Regions:
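Short linear functional motifs in flexible/disordered or boundary regions
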Residues: 21-22, 45, 196
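Oxidative protein folding and maturation machinery
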Residues: 106-328
Length: 328
């Protein structure tokens, strides 16, 4: 079996549309952050959903960095590439970030009620992941010899605990519940599909001998989410890419054929375009193209693909706007 790792990325170009320019009169959304123990020269605010919402500040210990912006929809702001903060239109949110080695502690969460509730929930989810020592990098799991059986069991436990946290949370919007669920599912289901194959490649233990049951049935019952909030999660969309190749590999096996993973950009585009439809196809292809452009190699190859995508599959005008911006 061939190993394929879809790298998680939260660069701005990995965005799915939930953000449009705000209409006149709509309240601005405000984020303020104070950092302690941060060693970088600059503090960066980068929106996961759009490259058009971002800001940077010179880093000074304890200084309040304030950014007000327009958005009509829910977004996730990434601070210094590590800390995710959830914001909706008109929210005001303040947090303190304390850097201790590789860990970032979020404290003093204050602001509008919805923003406080949403970000308390997000931090509770992060705490669960930390306490479980649930790693985001699958290659690191293989290096530590975490068995696929353990990873899959831990993934199921994580999803259950996150669902329980969401049920218990008060004053949270459907959007934050959906986003957190989709992001968690992205990590969990990617582990189901990818980790047994990666572990077999790294540790030379065939999938059939990993005591995980029938690999071909690990994703039974899965139905891709089609809502905009779920498709705005890079983690979830990465998983959807892997799901396409997983299903096509299983189909090839059932037909007695050998599946060849599409390693080339153009081949991946073609396979994903055939597998999905509607909003899911639009989001997946958009992310694939953004990822390729951000890679910075042979970017001119994207021209023909972008034209094909716009002509045949693009429904979301914002995606086209971002691609045009990236190609300038």
């Amino acid at each position: 079996m061939m190993r394929i790792t879809i790298k998680k990325t939260v660069q701005y170009a990995f965005c799915l549309l939930t953000v449009l320019p705000a209409m006149a009169g709509n309240p601005k959304t405000t984020l303020s952050v104070q950092t302690y123990g941060y060693k970088g020269n600059m503090v960066y605010f980068d929106c996961v959903q759009t490259p058009f919402i971002k800001q940077e500040f010179h880093s000074n210990e304890g200084e309040e960095h304030v950014y007000s912006f327009d958005t009509e929809s829910s977004i996730v702001m990434l601070v210094n590439g590590r800390t995710q903060l959830f914001l909706q239109q008109g929210d005001s949110l303040h947090v303190n970030l304390t850097y201790e080695g590789k860990q970032v502690n979020v404290s003093n969460i204050s602001g509008t009620n919805g923003a406080v509730s949403a970000n308390n929930l997000m931090q509770s989810v992060e705490e669960v992941r930390r306490n479980m020592r649930y790693r985001s990098q699958l290659l690191g799991c293989a290096a530590l010899n975490i068995t696929p059986q353990s990873r899959i069991n831990d993934s199921k436990t994580l999803l259950t605990r996150v669902q329980e946290l969401i049920k218990k949370a008060k004053n949270i919007s459907p959007e934050v519940a959906t986003y957190i669920t989709a992001e968690t599912e992205g990590s969990v289901y990617l582990s189901f599909m990818e980790y047994p194959v990666l572990y077999a490649d790294v540790r030379k233990v065939p999938v059939e001998k990993q005591e995980i049951g029938d690999y071909s049935r690990l994703m039974d019952g899965f139905v891709p989410r089609t809502d905009a909030m779920s498709l705005s999660s890079p983690e979830y969309v990465s998983m959807l890419m892997r799901y396409c190749f997983y299903r096509n590999e299983l189909k090839a096996r059932q037909e007695g054929k050998t599946y060849v993973f599409p390693n080339e950009f153009e081949a991946m585009y073609g396979e994903l375009a055939q597998f999905y439809d509607g909003a899911v196809r639009d989001a997946v292809l958009y992310n694939l193209i953004c990822n390729f452009i951000r890679g910075g190699k042979e970017v001119d190859r994207a021209d023909a693909i972008i034209k094909d995508y716009k002509d045949k599959y693009n429904k979301n005008a914002f995606y086209a706007k971002v691609l045009d911006s990236l190609m300038q």
